Amino acid sequence: MELHSLSKRNSPVDPCNALEWSSGETSGDHIEEATIRDAFCYQKNLVSTPRADVVEVCRLSTSPASPTSLLQDSAIQTSFSLSGPPDSGNNQVMADRKVCNCCSQELETSFTYVDENVNLEQRSQRSPSAKGSNHPVDLGWGNPNEWSHETAMSLMSEDDDDTSSEATSSGKSVDYGFISAILFLVTGILLVIISYIVPREVTVDPNTVAAREMERLEKESAMLGAHLDRCVIAGLCLLTLGGVVLSCLLMMSMWKGELYRRNRFASSKESAKLYGSFNFRMKTSTNEDTLELSLVEEDALAVQS
């Protein structure tokens, strides 16, 4: 045994052709060496084949591994480690075998990963169908209660916007009209005051002034009096115009206030019918003939009745 192992280590004999040297060994050693040599010869013959063939062989050999195949793999690895520095063919065989093992592992993992994806896709395909079968009415309208609430809120906001726009527009018109009326009144008053303050007659002594100079002064005073009369007339017109504008604005404001009060009263009646609130009730007193407005709750009236 020792001589045979020494000669085997020292001589580079092809193990594929040296099957007769191991005839005198024990049965277990003979079986192990036979399997090692068979595998090595098979891999050496595959060196000349392309890499794609090796990959195909590896794929075909990815069946459930038996204990004998595992024993052969371990024996091949030990034989390569003991045989000294391997050549380029042996290196290529080892690399191909490692690639085959990696490919088999990747194929196994990718197979399970594909199964998971298929299951997930099947679940995702079943979920919308189940949702569609359970909720056929849901077409994107949402909850009808929420929709009605949103519509009511939108209508209320539109009404508020309309009332606010009307109030702002009426307020602007009323403000401009009131300012113009005040300006007319103030201007008319000032013109009337100026026309009465400015003196119209000549205050010069006629004995100290020549006759022609006196005539000229009288003409100027007459022209000044005419201008002052015009100022008085303009002032009175402006006062009248300011009073008319102010009275019109006052009437318009009263009319709008009455309309607003009626609208609010009507809305309060509607809200009282819907939700219950305070209502105005006219009642006559037994002692006096006057009418009194009293606020009575609708709920209290219902309880009393």
UniProtKB/Swiss-Prot annotation:
Gene: Tmem74
Tagged with keyword Ribonucleoprotein: no
Species annotation: Mus musculus (Mouse)
Ranges annotated as biased composition (Polar residues): 122-132
Positions of transmembrane segments: 178-198, 232-252
Protein name: Transmembrane protein 74
Coiled coil: none
UniProt subcellular location: Lysosome membrane; Cytoplasmic vesicle, Autophagosome membrane
Function: Plays an essential role in autophagy. TMEM74-induced autophagy may involve PI3K signal transduction.
Residues where Phosphoserine is found: 11
Primary subcellular site in the record, as a coarse category: membrane
Key words of the record: Autophagy, Cytoplasmic vesicle, Lysosome, Membrane, Phosphoprotein, Transmembrane, Transmembrane helix
GO CC entries: autophagosome membrane; cytoplasmic vesicle; lysosomal membrane; plasma membrane
GO process terms (BP): general adaptation syndrome, behavioral process; macroautophagy
An MF annotation (GO) of this entry: transmembrane transporter binding
